[in-house]
Amino acid sequence: LMIPQRDRFGRIVTFTARALNSQATVKYLNGKDCAIYKKSSAIFGIDIALKAARQTGKVYLVEGAPDVMRLQSLGIANVVASLGGCWSEEQLSCFNKFGCTLCFIPDHDVPKEGDEFGAGEKFVFRNGRLATEMGFQVSVREIPSSGSQKQDADSYIVSLERWESLSEKDFILWYAAKHYDASAANDEQLKVIADVCDLLVNVQSE
């Protein structure tokens, strides 16, 4: 499935491709950098999301183009994706000038063998930290666990009722709850506390 990607003015600058076969080795293919497209600064859905973000003061960040299109189909216009997993400072700074708060909606991925967290959680750990360090107010809407089955915004949020059922949590509190283990050794607990304190330093007083 070929999906056009537009810049903030609505001009097509590249295409992203989504495999329709669930057994495909590569799920997504993105366009290469060129004179009119730079992956590190491009944002999928930005042409629609910016106007809505100015009105709501909030932007929802998901992982893939189908996630954006699913939420747009439900009337949620202020949603974007980086199409690469990692958000760059250049991409996030686009929302700084509008004073937007950011809310991440990670995929629910089953952790790989030996891993404590799934890829979707790691996506938010990394990008939520960057956004917090840049001075954004950050929150998370987490898709509930479905056992061994992967769920993303496209497959789970199929109605406004599903959307409204997702509770929104402060990123730092969510991050702390994910990492802190009351039964862990003292030194491990102290590492988590120090990590959370590093995040709290970036919180701006209102």
Describe each PLM feature range.
Residues 84-103, 110, 130-132, 176-185, ...:
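A compositional/structural signature marking long, glycine- and acidic/polar-rich segments
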Residues 96, 102-162:
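Conserved phosphate-handling catalytic cores of large alpha/beta enzymes
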Residues 53-56, 109, 160, 203-204:
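Short coil/turn helix-boundary motifs
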Residues 1-102, 115-123:
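Phosphate-handling DNA/RNA-contact segment within nucleic-acid enzymes
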Residues 36-39, 61, 81, 85, ...:
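Hydrophobic alpha-helical scaffolding
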Residues 140-206:
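C-terminal or mid-to-C-terminal helical accessory/interaction module adjacent to the motor/catalytic core
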